[in-house]
C-alpha cells in the first residue's frame, strides 16, 4: 500500500494509466510492465502461473471463496484444475471447495448474513473455522473425523438461500442455455429497449455509446477488493445498479418479467463483438 501522504486520487484519475505512478512522484517498475503487457504473453508465462502447472500440485486442498470474492474464479480454477490434471493421486482425489455469499477480506466469513444490500438469511451462517479445523485434524493429525466422506463441493444458492452439495463442478445437472442481446432503438440506460432472451438476433443494429474518461462509470459493488473503510476502494457485494443503469453510456439488457424461477449456477461465457473509435 502507498503511504497516506501520497495523494492517491491524483494517481487514480491520471491518464494515460502507464504514467499514473509518475504523477505522484513515484517510479513503480512492475506497474509499467503490467500496462505494457495487457494480454497473456511470455512475460506472464515466465512467472509460471498456477493454472499452467496443476499437474505438479501434490497436496490436498480445501479451497473457499465467496460469490462476490475478487478471487472467486481462481478458486474454482484451482479446484477443477487440480482435480483434472494433477499427476499426484492423493492431490487429484482430495480437493474440496466451499463457496458462500461472501466478499473478499470480510473477516470471519460465515458469521454474518448481510452482504452488500442483501440479507441471505440464517442459512448463510456457517462455522467455517470448524470445517478448517476438521480438515487440518484429518490431514495433519491423522484423525478420521469423517470430513473426507462428505461431498467435495458445497455452494450457497443465492435466492433460494440454501446450501447445495455435489462431488463435481460444474454441477452434473447443469443445463447450459444460450441467451442473446437485442435492441431496436438502442439499449442505452434503463430507458432503452435492450432485451435479453433465448432468440438469436436477426439483422439488428449495433448499440453505440460515448465514453468520457473524465466521467467514468463508477463501480457499485460486485467482486471488488478489499475494504470499504478505504476511502478509495469501491463498495462491495450485491448492490442496486440503477444509478449506473440510468446513464446513457451504459447499455442495459434485461429479460422480460420472469413467470417462473430461474436458477443461474455455473460457468458463464460471454461472446461480444465490439469496436472503438
Model-assigned labels for residue ranges:
Residues 46-47, 91-122:
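Catalytic cores of eukaryotic secretory-pathway lumenal/extracellular enzymes that build
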Residues 54-57, 89-92, 170-173:
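Extracellular/periplasmic catalytic domains that process cell-envelope and extracellular macromolecules
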Residues 57, 63-65:
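Short beta-strand/loop motif that positions the catalytic acidic residue
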Residues 67-72:
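Acidic catalytic loop of the alpha/beta-hydrolase fold
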Amino acid at each position: 500500500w502507498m503511504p497516506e501522504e501520497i495523494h492517491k486520487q491524483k494517481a487514480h484519475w491520471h491518464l494515460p494509466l502507464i504514467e499514473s505512478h509518475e504523477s505522484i512522484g513515484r517510479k513503480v517498475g512492475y506497474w509499467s510492465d503490467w500496462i505494457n503487457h495487457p494480454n497473456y504473453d511470455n512475460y506472464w508465462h515466465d512467472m509460471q502461473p498456477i493454472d499452467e502447472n496443476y499437474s505438479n500440485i501434490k497436496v490436498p486442498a480445501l479451497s473457499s471463496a465467496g460469490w462476490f470474492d475478487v478471487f472467486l474464479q481462481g478458486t474454482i480454477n484451482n479446484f477443477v484444475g487440480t482435480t483434472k490434471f494433477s499427476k499426484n493421486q492423493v492431490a487429484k482425489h482430495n480437493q474440496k471447495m466451499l463457496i458462500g455469499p461472501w466478499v473478499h477480506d470480510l473477516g470471519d466469513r460465515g458469521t454474518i448474513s448481510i452482504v452488500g444490500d442483501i440479507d441471505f438469511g440464517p442459512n448463510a451462517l456457517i462455522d467455517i473455522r470448524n470445517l478448517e479445523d476438521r480438515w487440518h485434524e484429518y490431514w495433519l493429525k491423522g484423525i478420521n473425523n469423517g470430513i473426507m466422506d462428505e461431498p467435495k463441493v458445497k455452494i450457497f444458492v443465492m435466492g433460494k438461500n440454501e446450501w447445495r452439495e455435489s462431488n463435481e463442478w460444474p454441477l452434473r445437472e447443469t443445463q447450459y442455455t444460450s441467451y442473446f442481446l437485442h435492441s431496436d432503438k438502442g439499449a442505452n440506460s434503463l430507458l432503452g429497449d435492450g432485451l435479453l432472451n433465448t432468440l438469436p438476433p436477426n439483422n439488428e443494429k449495433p448499440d453505440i455509446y460515448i465514453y468520457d474518461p473524465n466521467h467514468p462509470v463508477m463501480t457499485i459493488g460486485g467482486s471488488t477488493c478489499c475494504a470499504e473503510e478505504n476511502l478509495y476502494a469501491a463498495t462491495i457485494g450485491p448492490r442496486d445498479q440503477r444509478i449506473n443503469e440510468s446513464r446513457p453510456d451504459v447499455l442495459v439488457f434485461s429479460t422480460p418479467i420472469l413467470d417462473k424461477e430461474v436458477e443461474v449456477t455455473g460457468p458463464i461465457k460471454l461472446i461480444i463483438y465490439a469496436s472503438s473509435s
